[in-house]
Amino acid sequence: MNRFLTLLFIFFAICTDISAQEAEMEQHLFDTMRDGDKAAVVAIHIGAEDADAKQNIEKFNAMLRKAYPTIDFREAWTSRILIQQVHSNGGGNIPTTDELFSQLNKDGYTHLLIQSSNIVNSTDMQILRYEVDAAKETFKQIRLGEPLLTDETDYEEVLKATAAAYGSEKEANVLMCEGTHGSENAQYALLDYILKVQDYKSWFVATSGGYPSLSSLVKQLKKQKVKKVHLIPFLFTAGSKATSAIAHEWAQQLQRAGYKVTTELHNLSDVDAIIDIFENHLRHAEMFHRYSPKELKMMTR
């Protein structure tokens, strides 16, 4: 297993480095603007199911507004279910990504700088990449920042910030991550591996419905003869309702396994250093033009 994780780390680090760095050139987004051009900074979220989740989203949005105070700000959600919930409750109309792009085009915008609140390179993030690539025919420049966990430095900085904010010295700290599918699991396995490489003693990663799983977590806890567990939501836009539901389910299973459980009430959105990493990714997207698959294909001819 150790050999497998080592190879996984190397493979993921290499793939990330190639996709995020080598296939790009330095070209400041706003330097490409000409008379008559219009720019917007765009925040993309899955959505919010309660007031707390909306506050978490607003912290992210406030970061974008502060970082680019003279640029128009826009927001879109990717979950139609959450959009409909807000609309049904009288919260107004929030556009999907496609709807927002269409409206921005009608309003004469030519340059878009986009950052999502995705933690990992999830299916939702992959769909957003596809939508951005499709919109490149519509706008003069459209740039997309990377998710929170992109290269190995991100992993290390996120773990350092999370440990400083929520770590417990008297209990085993468990990062509660959202369930993933297929190859997405590798990103949380990598997170768990870096915890061990960086010598974060008594720190663990588990996902709801993915890997590392709760059952694999319990095996690790037994090996280290852990008695107390501190659950830490490794979430960003989730509100108290969703976080509490996940934590309650996990706590029950761990208690049945014989552990005393405490739960952190906050998540990653309350950590300033985490917000800063998102901003750094957006700044990078502003400064560098990333080649599309079509552009890369043309370059190899």
Pin down the residues of each PLM region.
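Sec-dependent N-terminal signal peptides
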Residues: 4-14
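Sec/Tat signal peptide C-region and signal peptidase I cleavage site
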Residues: 16-20
